[in-house]
UniProtKB/Swiss-Prot annotation:
GO biological process: anaphase-promoting complex-dependent catabolic process; cell division; protein branched polyubiquitination; protein K11-linked ubiquitination; protein K48-linked ubiquitination
UniProt record similarity statement: Belongs to the APC13 family.
Keyword set includes Cell cycle: yes
UniProt name for this protein: Anaphase-promoting complex subunit 13
Location relative to the cell: Nucleus
Cellular component GO terms, alphabetical: anaphase-promoting complex
Record has Membrane as a keyword: no
Lineage: Eukaryota, Metazoa, Chordata, Craniata, Vertebrata
Name of encoding gene: Anapc13
One family name in Pfam for this protein: Apc13p
InterPro entries: Apc13
Biological role stated in the UniProt entry: Component of the anaphase promoting complex/cyclosome (APC/C), a cell cycle-regulated E3 ubiquitin ligase that controls progression through mitosis and the G1 phase of the cell cycle. The APC/C complex acts by mediating ubiquitination and subsequent degradation of target proteins: it mainly mediates the formation of 'Lys-11'-linked polyubiquitin chains and, to a lower extent, the formation of 'Lys-48'- and 'Lys-63'-linked polyubiquitin chains. The APC/C complex catalyzes assembly of branched 'Lys-11'-/'Lys-48'-linked branched ubiquitin chains on target proteins.
The organism of origin for this protein: Mus musculus (Mouse)
Pathways involved: Protein modification; protein ubiquitination
Region (Disordered), start-end ranges: 33-56
Length: 74
């Protein structure tokens, strides 16, 4: 039936306790420099990566909002 789970027993033979407990050494994990936070954080300790900081939208265009305000009254 379609509503019953069908398990493939062949996969169970591939995964054993040694495989489950195996971990990649921390030194072998390659992280691109653009994904790392800045090494010298003099501005309050932000944890954003360089890529996240570049993607941040900091221009709020408040001047444009001020210039486009319709005059008050009828």
């Amino acid at each position: 039936m379609d509503s019953e789970v069908q398990r493939d027993g062949r996969i169970l033979d591939l995964i054993d306790d040694a495989w489950r407990e195996d971990k990649l050494p921390y030194e072998d994990v390659a992280i691109p420099l653009s994904e790392l936070p800045e090494p010298e954080q003099d501005n309050g300790g932000t944890t954003e990566s360089v890529k996240e900081q570049e993607m941040k939208w900091t221009d709020l265009a408040l001047q444009g909002l001020h210039e486009n305000v319709p005059p008050a009254g009828n």
